[in-house]
């Protein structure tokens, strides 16, 4: 069985242990250590990382198994390990965001079927690769969603149809309605953060940038600047106050990129400060108008809530004009 070392600096993270092919041994073995760097491989005595799923500036995500469940269920282990060029204030901000993600997943994910559940959050202190020093690692463990994100779907299948976009809106807007009702704003909606499970349900992922609405006014002057370029609206990019409509804007940009096959910077006219996307997509005037309103630069002019967008989507289409004869 292959186990993956979660130490970011490990030069050879893959470890093969043939004795762990036996499930009984896997369940009772006290610990296994990386044969290259000595890092403990079984995390919190139960989570067994198998492979790297992805990594970014603040850490990495691993596919793992929980050996204390009857089926040794799959899960995702996220490691917080930011890049080494952060100053102490930036490092603390990054750590706070990681802890916030765990808090939000515990509060929201365990209550909503389209947000991953949180299973664990813990710290591990181990000897550093530098003699005489210690390293601290922070982990969270969450539900594994077996499927593809919308970015992967687009890469495989090409542009989305209007019917597919309507399905995305009808599935994700109720999730946002739930998130906003619990006092949070996601702040990082984009195709790669929406995952479709094998059963077809859409999940909202990556709550690392979430912000509590109740704390926005007090902290807006010192925004952390966490956003994805092109998907974030003006108020978020300028570090100003954010709203539920901030997420609606990002969801609309997500829809545009999937409809047109173009990146946000190819669709936004910076000279005239407007979105020019309609010539690249064939959609009904009704959907186009809804997306355009979600994309208005002023938060006050957009729909104020996910409820309002859902209501606009469910309204009957206007009746055709009646032609009268003189």
Residue ranges of model-derived segments:
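Activation segment signature within eukaryotic-like protein kinase domains
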Residues: 168-169
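Catalytic-loop of the protein kinase fold
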Residues: 180-196
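AlphaC helix of the eukaryotic protein kinase fold
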Residues: 88-109
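Protein kinase glycine-rich loop
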Residues: 50-57, 61
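Short beta-strand micro-motifs within the conserved protein kinase catalytic domain, predominantly
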Residues: 117-138
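Activation segment
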Residues: 209-210
């Amino acid at each position: 069985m292959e186990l993956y070392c979660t130490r970011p600096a490990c030069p050879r993270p893959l470890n093969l242990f043939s004795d762990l092919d036996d499930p009984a041994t896997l369940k009772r073995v006290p610990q296994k250590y990386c044969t290259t760097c000595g890092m403990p491989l079984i995390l919190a005595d139960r989570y067994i990382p198998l492979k790297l799923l992805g990594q970014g500036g603040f850490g990495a995500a691993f596919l793992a198994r929980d050996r204390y469940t009857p089926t040794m269920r799959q899960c995702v282990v996220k490691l917080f390990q930011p890049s080494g060029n952060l100053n102490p204030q930036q490092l603390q901000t990054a750590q706070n965001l990681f802890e916030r993600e765990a808090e939000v997943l515990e509060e929201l994910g365990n209550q909503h079927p389209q947000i991953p559940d949180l299973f664990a959050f813990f710290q591990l202190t181990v000897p550093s690769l530098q003699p005489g020093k210690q390293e601290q690692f922070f982990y969270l463990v969450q539900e594994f969603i077996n499927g593809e994100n919308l970015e992967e779907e687009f890469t495989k299948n090409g542009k989305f149809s209007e019917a597919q976009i309507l399905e995305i809106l009808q599935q994700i807007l109720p999730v946002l309605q739930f998130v906003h009702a619990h006092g949070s704003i996601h702040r990082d909606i984009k195709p790669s953060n929406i995952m479709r499970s094998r059963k077809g349900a859409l999940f909202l992922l990556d709550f690392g940038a979430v912000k509590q609405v109740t704390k926005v006014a007090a902290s807006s002057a010192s925004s952390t600047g966490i956003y994805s370029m092109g998907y974030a609206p003006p108020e978020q990019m300028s570090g100003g106050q954010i709203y539920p409509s901030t997420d609606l804007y990002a969801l609309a940009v997500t829809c545009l990129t999937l409809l047109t096959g173009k990146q946000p910077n190819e669709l936004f006219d910076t000279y005239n400060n407007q979105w020019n996307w309609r010539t690249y997509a064939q959609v009904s005037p009704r959907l186009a108008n809804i997306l355009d309103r979600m994309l208005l630069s002023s938060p006050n002019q957009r729909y104020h809530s996910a409820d309002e967008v859902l209501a606009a989507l469910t309204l009957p289409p206007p009746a055709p004009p009646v032609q009268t004869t003189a």
